[in-house]
Amino acid sequence: NNSMLGGEILSGEISYKGYGEDFLFKNSKSDFKATLNLNNINLDYHKDWPPIDNLAAEVIINNDELVANIISGYIFNAKIDNTSIIVRNLSQNNHHVLINTEIYSHTNDAKNFIVQSPLKNISTIDQLTKNIIGNIDINLNLDIPLDSEEIEFGGLVFFDKASIESGIPE
């Protein structure tokens, strides 16, 4: 599975303390850490979700956990910043990607994201966003299981200079 479609590794650091035969997850006393500073990454993280473009991030793998601190990136024209991504228990199956993010954008980008993701199957979201036009500030928490259709999410959406169209003819 190639989720990183392109970009640069600006710097990297790897350390491992333990026996070679225990590498990577075979002995809890082993200690593995890798840190990568990435830039201009195009990330297709899941086939059902829109990709992230021009991503700049610090990625840390510390033993059995991956943490990505997103500095900047874009989904469509929506700017992503102040984002953390965590994948725990890398050595096990049934991975969950936990995402906490803040995105400031226009409702058109939010609508495109919804239409091109599993969120389109949640009628409440469609109804809430259908007639709203303007800028939005999204604080979102997602739990995306990589081998399941169930998605858990929560968060806040703030509207800035937005309007609601009634759909009533003039």
PLM feature segments, named:
Residues 41-99, 120, 135, 160-170:
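Strand-loop-strand
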Residues 1-27, 35-39, 43, 89-152, ...:
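Extended amphipathic, helix-rich lipid-handling scaffolds
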